[in-house]
Amino acid sequence: MKKFFSMLLAFVMLLALAGCGGDNSTPAQDQGGSSDAGQTQQDGNEAGSGDAAASLEDGIGDYHIGIVTGSVSQSEDDRRGAEAFQAKYGEDKVTLAIYPDNFTEELETTIQTIVNLSDDPQMKAVIVNQSVPGTTEAFRQIKERRPDIICIAGEGHEDLPEIGSAADLVCNNDFVSRGYLIIRTAHELGADTFVHISFPRHMAYETMSRRVAVMEEACKEFNMEFVLETAPDPTSDVGIPGAQAYILENVPAWVQKYGENAAYFCTNDAHTEPLLKQLVEYGGYFIEADLPSPLMGYPGALGLDLTEEAGDFEKILAKVESALVEKGAADHFGTWAYSYGYTLSAGLAEHAKNVINGVSDITDMDAVAAALNVYSPKAQWNGAGYTNATTGVKSDNVFLIYQDTYIMGNPGRFMGNADVEIPEKYFTVS
């Protein structure tokens, strides 16, 4: 796999560093960022190049952009990213909507929530993040009614070829590369066992089933034990409270069973906070969340008030890192320095704006990268186009992306994962 936009991002990072007076500290050490989300976005406006860079100075014209996310309880970062984009361009230009928490049982409501945005005659783009079941059908209905509306899917829960057939653009976390890199990082930190926590609905998704297959294969390469654990689905009858209670109750037994050198991973956002809370208490490793962010589970697990740091991911990361060090958990917990969900919601909307303004092509990966960097100005990203493991067909509108992993400690450090060459065999593991 080629790092198709590594040179662009190197240039982005160079400009971002120059804007900080040449400071080469990690995000957790650099306290120079603004606590205002808008300021972070303005800093990112300097990060692009060529037409993409120029477009970042442009506002939203006589049209509207809609963003659909989950609720704060299900996917807070996704929602906060949408709110940041709306705050930047105005409520009169950006419409936000929330699909039901129990989206699997309320499929028609989910579809209608997305489709309703097309009732606005000035609507020109609809972004859904995460693209839960029903998004594909909603996009098809929108295209039938309003073919002029750009449809962008972030983090698809449906099969990527399927949602790619209805969406103009799909961006997903790189489940293949990350499946390998998470195991590799756990091994480098000293873990001897990897515990994967999920439930049948998630394991039916191609993205998650392929990732877990890659993880299991990578454990063989690094001589680690691989374990599957099942936890309740938060969209089932037990709801989020019941699912979280299960994690809280079972982690101590898992730590006793697998030892303190086991690394854990869960596929659901709602499981993350209780998992982190108990691992900090009882011992273990956590490389990064399913959708990584310093906000994903850490504030609640550590009892942090991040009101003053809101919108400034460098300060958020520093506070989370400091709390972990104080609790004796240094070098055991990681994340992406900038929230994936936050960046994806806001960045894909930024890209849609650039496409509507006529300065970017919808499937130009360099332009997508520049838009993402508006909300993650110092991030090192990598990725590749999606290839169907069964058919071998490569999609021209589905992209897989990931950010370098940051392990929190004293000092913390980036693992250099964005520069690691993934062994070719893992791209056909399924």
What is each stretch, according to the model?
Residues L15-G19:
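C-terminal motif of bacterial Sec signal peptides marking the signal peptidase cleavage site
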Residues A82, F175-L228, A352:
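An alpha-beta-alpha
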Residues I142-F175:
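Flexible loop/hinge segments that line or gate small-molecule binding clefts
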Residues I316-S430:
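Hinge/cleft segment of the Venus flytrap/periplasmic-binding protein
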Residues A53-F85, Y89, L96-Q112, I127-P133:
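Extracytoplasmic "Venus flytrap"
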Residues G66-T69, D120-S131, I149-G154, V195-I197, ...:
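Periplasmic-binding protein-like
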Residues A218-F226, E273-N357:
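Extracellular/periplasmic periplasmic-binding protein-like sensory domains
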Residues G59, L169-V195, Y246, F313-L324, ...:
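Hydrophobic alpha-helical segments within soluble ligand-binding/sensing domains
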